[in-house]
Amino acid sequence: MTVYHFVGIKGTGMSALAQVLHDMNYTVQGSDVEKRFFTQKALEERGIPILPFNKENIKPGYTVIAGNAFPETHEEIQAAHELGVPVIRYHRFLGEFLQKFTSIAVTGSHGKTSTTGLLAHVMQGVHPTSYLIGDGTGKGIEGSKYFVFEACEYRRHFLSYFPDYAIMTNIDFDHPDYFANIDDVFSAFQEMALQVKKGIIACGDDEYLQKIQAKVPVLFYGFGDDNDFQARNVVKTTEGTAFDVFVRNTFFASFEIPHFGDHNVLNALAVIALCHYEEMDVRIIQERLKTFQGVKRRFSEKVLGNQILIDDYAHHPREIIATIDAARQKYPGREIVAIFQPHTYTRTQTFLREFAESLQQADQVYLCDIFGSAREHHGKLSIHDLQAQIPNSRLIQEDNTSILKQHENAVLIFMGAGDIQKFQEAYERTVHS
């Protein structure tokens, strides 16, 4: 049997896929940069070897799974070609692998990871379910009927997938380094919809998803009256959220989730709709929804003295608003402090005004330098351009996080898709020192 070698194994999708294959008794190893990433822990716990990049890592008989960030000129990929070792890109491999299961893709501009995690958690209460989540978490169960996975629209990678079902959470303009505009994003989702084989669960409150055409049934969920699955009588507390679900205007059941904000109600509705479609027991759905702990880097909380620290992946204006809203629901009356690290120059440039507006939902804003992606290390603008748009905002460096101590009893939200965790870790050290 072949050895699967992952080039860039610390990537979130790559790490999760490596875990899935390992759990299903395939032989797995991988290589990456030396820098430590939060995705490593699960790999290390499974004993999956993580090697430094070196062309000597590639041996005859291997199969190379290559991360999308690595060009054909990468030394390991070149070595594979020279040895006649097959090289398969991550999304292509996953697309072929899915065919062994009843597959459920979770896609959308926002909410993919949380919804994938929630769906996997609920379905595991009913059926053996393998899953791949974009927070670097994966689990493979031999003999599982279902495979739940996160499908990313970036560079249209999700067009490698032909799933049985798809959940579509929303369509929004993001990834401006690739997509030209919202119509370009919509066209990608429309193409994806035509590849789904059994059914689509889509948010009917989203104006773009309402226009989706498909060859299979489309069930809509949301708060609006026109949806097939509608949330009504929403009750928000500091413990979570409760709501009733009506299916085509007929009461179905009541549900509780230990999460906050309208976006989490919508995520739960999507899961309820899919499980209902697959005729799963409503009592199990209710119980599983109550016990979901969330996914990595999505409203991850920690108590530090009198302060609450929240780590969140929010890197788009709409996500920032959702995260701040959730914090206000759980911690009413507390000062909300946003510490934000913009992710990529192109996104910051494109949404400069929207970032300023969304961040001003917080009581105080601190800004970190822009985090450039692997594909872009500098841009025409700097963090000062965003600061100029936000009255009373301040810049923060990794070595001066102690200024956050002045916000006693506050909720500090560290947001971003780069390495914003470094700032939280630095702050925790100043408090403990």
Swiss-Prot record:
Keywords: ATP-binding, Cell cycle, Cell division, Cell shape, Cell wall biogenesis/degradation, Cytoplasm, Ligase, Nucleotide-binding, Peptidoglycan synthesis
UniProt GO cellular component terms: cytoplasm
Role played: Cell wall formation.
Top enzyme category: ligase
Family designation: Belongs to the MurCDEF family.
Taxonomy of the source species: Bacteria, Bacillati, Bacillota, Bacilli, Bacillales
Binding-site residues, ATP: 108-114
The protein's name: UDP-N-acetylmuramate--L-alanine ligase
GO BP annotations listed: cell division; cell wall organization; peptidoglycan biosynthetic process; regulation of cell shape
Catalytic reaction(s) noted: UDP-N-acetyl-alpha-D-muramate + L-alanine + ATP = UDP-N-acetyl-alpha-D-muramoyl-L-alanine + ADP + phosphate + H(+)
Gene: murC
UniProt EC number: 6.3.2.8
Gene Ontology molecular function terms on file: ATP binding; UDP-N-acetylmuramate-L-alanine ligase activity
InterPro entries on file: Mur-like_cat_sf, Mur_ligase_C, Mur_ligase_C_dom_sf, Mur_ligase_cen, Mur_ligase_N, MurCDEF_pg_biosynth, UDP-N-AcMur_Ala_ligase_MurC
Subcellular location: Cytoplasm
Organism, as annotated: Geobacillus sp. (strain WCH70)
